[in-house]
């Protein structure tokens, strides 16, 4: 099978003189081709020689740009075959509730976590109605691979979880999750979770956390987790960079029980 390759004649790889290193400019130009799907996932990057001829840059500069994108997770090197656009992280919803950390580790990706903020305060109305709480502990964490952000994760928790939450606030605890807090440290089993998925424009704080322009499209997932008796435990909101993360679900034609499966909501306003 012939792999898809970037059309260099149509690609904008112009490099300008200025304070931004040429390698960074080339890396950003190639990244733009990936985001715009002119070079789709699984597509092969042009050869080093082709990139040199097209960009007018040196071999060292081209290698630095490609290496930068490899470290950020945009490209993967396959021995004897070339360099290819990396597949996005895929979360299969029909195989049970998994944390983003579990999904990434299953894909061979070791996440890094930045704790951006944590504070107790008034719950937003929707969160208050869901959890039945006036105040919540809000924890904002950024998930990344290398220096490339994947998702902004905002967890709304009961303020009385106490010391059990401390590992979540440690920047070195990259594999810590709210589920680990509930199940391992508090002995509360997660029975099920609802996922509401929609697209939105990045707000200023989301854009800043994910390295995007304000208003850029992001994939938003609202996850509400419940105990066996149907009590809501937490609400976690994920803002994903859409080119780096995707969801997949396999369903039978019919599902037993009310509320089972996927419910489509349309807003034509």
Curated annotation (Swiss-Prot):
One of its GO terms (biological process) is negative regulation of DNA-templated transcription. Residues 48-67 bind DNA. SMART domains: HTH_GNTR, UTRA. PROSITE patterns: HTH_GNTR (PS50949). Disruption phenotype: Deletion mutant is compromised for survival upon exposure to oxidative stress and infection in guinea pigs. Deletion of the gene does not affect colony morphology, growth pattern, biofilm formation and sensitivity to isoniazid, rifampicin, levofloxacin and ethambutol. About 200 genes are differentially expressed in the mutant strain in comparison to the wild-type strain. One of its GO terms (molecular function) is DNA binding. InterPro entries: Bact_HTH_transcr_reg (IPR050679), Chorismate_lyase_/UTRA_dom_sf (IPR028978), Tscrpt_reg_HTH_GntR (IPR000524), UTRA (IPR011663), WH-like_DNA-bd_sf (IPR036388), WH_DNA-bd_sf (IPR036390). Pfam families: GntR (PF00392), UTRA (PF07702). Keywords: DNA-binding, Stress response, Transcription, Transcription regulation, Virulence. DNA-binding activity is increased in the presence of L-arabinose and inhibited by the small molecule I-OMe-Tyrphostin. Gene3D superfamilies: Chorismate lyase-like, Winged helix-like DNA-binding domain superfamily/Winged helix DNA-binding domain. Induction: Binds to its own promoter and probably autoregulates its expression. SUPFAM superfamilies: Chorismate lyase-like, Winged helix' DNA-binding domain. Residues 20-88 form the HTH gntR-type domain. The N-terminal domain binds DNA and the C-terminal region plays a pivotal role in dimer formation. Transcriptional regulator required for survival in oxidative stress and for establishing infection in host tissues. Regulates the expression of a subset of genes involved in oxidative stress adaptation and virulence, enabling the bacteria to adapt and persist in host tissues. Homodimer. This is HTH-type transcriptional regulator Rv0792c. It comes from Mycobacterium tuberculosis (strain ATCC 25618 / H37Rv).
